[in-house]
């Protein structure tokens, strides 16, 4: 049994046939789904889906793309939302300097705000980082110095050096379908070396469909293809990888019920 640790069930391509999408995934052995929010306007819908669906959980947070739109976000609002039923994580949040859709200082401010709430509640921070390794690491190191908090780098595509540094800080790493792409050699090499107790798998659906589904809308069930590829890459059985990545999910997102 697998868990899709990061999907966007309210996004176009999935929301209109949400139940069918989930049923297809269940048929492939996916036992739980973490439905991720990216802006405050989504929180109610994301949490609502989790509340009405036994095997779906929710996160609340602001994607760095939307930082400028949330300059007035109050800590109390994020804290209250994060205390909601079936909310098991904070995010996704972080830094994206590739697109720079929002001011970098605004991104940093919200990243720290998310961490502060996560530290208080001891819920994992779900981190997006792209072309921002130095600042991401600097913030993580600084914030860890104020008190520990659980955290995950989602859809990991960064350098091996960055990966090792976040592992040294105690973070977990989630691998998406990008690892199946033929040009993802560096990611494939790093994915071989991630310790078993720090590895999770995800789809980031409806984006980033893995081989052999490239060009299609990604679905949570495609985590099976990513896990199959990853198990072969690491010289492990699919059953073994599924068992420990699922165990890792419930250990990290400890508010979820296995």
Where would I find each of the regions flagged by the language model?
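Mid-domain alpha/beta scaffold segments of enzyme catalytic cores
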Residues: 1-258
């Amino acid at each position: 049994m697998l868990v899709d640790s990061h999907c966007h069930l309210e996004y176009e391509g999935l929301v209109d046939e949400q139940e069918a999408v989930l049923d297809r995934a269940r048929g492939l052995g996916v036992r739980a789904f973490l439905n991720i929010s990216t802006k405050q306007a989504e929180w109610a819908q994301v949490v609502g889906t989790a509340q009405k669906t036994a095997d779906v959980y929710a996160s609340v947070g602001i994607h760095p793309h939307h930082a400028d739109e949330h300059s007035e976000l109050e800590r109390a609002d994020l804290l209250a939302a994060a205390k909601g039923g079936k909310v098991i994580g904070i995010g996704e949040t972080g830094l994206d300097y590739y697109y720079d859709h929002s001011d970098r200082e605004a991104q940093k401010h919200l990243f720290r705000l998310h961490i502060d709430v996560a530290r208080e509640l001891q819920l994992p921070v779900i981190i997006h980082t792209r072309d921002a390794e130095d600042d991401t690491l600097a913030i993580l190191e600084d914030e860890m110095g104020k008190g520990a908090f659980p955290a995950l780098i989602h859809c990991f595509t960064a350098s091996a050096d960055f990966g090792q540094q976040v592992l040294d800080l105690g973070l977990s790493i989630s691998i998406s379908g990008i690892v199946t792409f033929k040009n993802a050699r560096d990611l494939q090499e790093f994915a071989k070396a991630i310790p078993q107790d720090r590895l999770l798998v995800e789809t980031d659906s409806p984006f980033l469909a893995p081989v052999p589904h490239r060009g299609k809308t990604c679905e949570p069930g495609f985590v099976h293809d990513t896990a199959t590829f990853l198990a072969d890459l690491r010289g492990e059985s699919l059953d073994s990888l599924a068992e420990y990545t699922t165990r890792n999910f419930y250990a990290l997102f400890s508010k979820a019920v296995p």
